[in-house]
């Protein structure tokens, strides 16, 4: 699937080397691949490619919120959190009604431990895109753990578990139950 997708992007770039969206789409797919075990053997190569694609997209059109989000994520991977926050904010300023920019800015705020502020933007992103909100919900248990709100974290973890049980949710829920002092449920 990746090969065919990348070929389509490359064909679009060959026809128009300044087509920002083709670089953004390719960068977005590579970014997702960085966090899957299937592509870990290519992590270094893919990370470099992501940085190059996100920079290219941003240099073509710094007024495209999607390009700015990708560029922001490049700084996140480099652990340059002030730049990450700067560009995430730029993407949000370009289009405050863009769900991806709200989500990205929320997670950038987490790097600064500004969790309550982050919660606002993350929930806002979900409200803006009710059909795609599930793609934003997966990390919510961690946000609430960072906020020391174990009850809210458990609530989100249960929502995710009920949608599709996976052993990782059992582990997360056990850890949350321990935080809550409920050792009986932690053992289940």
Where are these regions (language model features)?
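Alpha-solenoid helical repeat architecture
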Residues: 98-104, 133-139, 164-175
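Alpha-helix capping/termination and helix-coil
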Residues: 113, 129, 147-149, 161-164, ...
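TPR/TPR-like (Sel1-like) alpha-helical repeat modules
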Residues: 50, 161-165, 178, 183-188
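Acidic, proline/glycine-rich low-complexity intrinsically disordered segments
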Residues: 1-128, 140-144, 155-158
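Alpha-helical linker/edge segments of TPR/alpha-solenoid repeat scaffolds
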Residues: 35-37, 146-153, 180-187
């Amino acid at each position: 699937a990746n090969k065919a997708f990348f070929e389509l992007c490359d064909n679009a770039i060959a026809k128009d080397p300044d087509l920002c969206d083709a670089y953004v789409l390719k960068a977005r797919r590579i970014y997702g691949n960085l966090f899957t075990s299937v592509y870990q053997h290519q992590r270094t190569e893919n990370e470099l490619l992501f940085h190059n694609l996100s920079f290219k997209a941003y240099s073509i059109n710094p007024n495209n919120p999607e390009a700015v989000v990708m560029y922001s994520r490049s700084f996140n991977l480099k652990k340059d959190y002030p730049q990450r926050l700067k560009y995430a904010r730029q993407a949000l300023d370009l289009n405050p009604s863009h769900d991806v920019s709200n989500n990205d800015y929320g997670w950038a705020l987490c790097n600064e431990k500004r969790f309550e502020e982050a919660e606002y933007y993350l929930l806002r992103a979900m409200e803006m895109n009710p059909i795609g909100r599930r793609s934003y919900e997966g990390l919510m248990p961690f946000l609430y753990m960072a906020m020391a709100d174990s009850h809210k974290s458990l609530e989100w973890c249960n929502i995710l578990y009920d949608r599709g049980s996976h052993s990782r949710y059992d582990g997360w829920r056990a850890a949350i139950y321990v935080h809550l002092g409920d050792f009986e449920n932690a053992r289940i």
